[in-house]
Amino acid sequence: MKRYARLAMALMLGFGLILGGCTTTQNQAAAPKEMTAKDLVAEAKKNICEVSVSEAKASLDKAGYVFLDCREPKEFKMGHVPSAMNIPRGLLEFTVDKKIPDKNTNIVVYCKVGGRGCLSACTLCRMGYKNVKNMAGGWVAWEKAGYPIE
């Protein structure tokens, strides 16, 4: 009888230790804050350089600048900045190093209104590109300014 009592006690103690180990503690790192697309763009804007449409146009007139349109191909076909290169936002990380191998290239990124451009510019900087700017207002602002389009 004593033997069964000890066994029962040992089992209860063992289960107590196991279950006690399943609880969370305050020492564990807090889960990262969930962010919306708007939050991600706002965070990216803090880490990139943005230029106005007129500044971007001045860059287009200079040699040595690459305009990177990060919209989808069907958007690009409907009109784009002259001589712009199209690399959709979703393929940027997998494609850009083949199309723009020199990390010192002067790059002006744009999308339709600015969100994808900000994210793309931030990604390029994180990938080691040193001279990246996002065109504030994107394609909509370029078109509204009456600048040339292809």
Located regions from the model:
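Structural scaffold elements adjacent to functional motifs in cytosolic proteins
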Residues: 67-69
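Rhodanese-like catalytic fold shared by cysteine-dependent sulfurtransferases
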Residues: 2-6, 10-13, 22-65, 74-106, ...
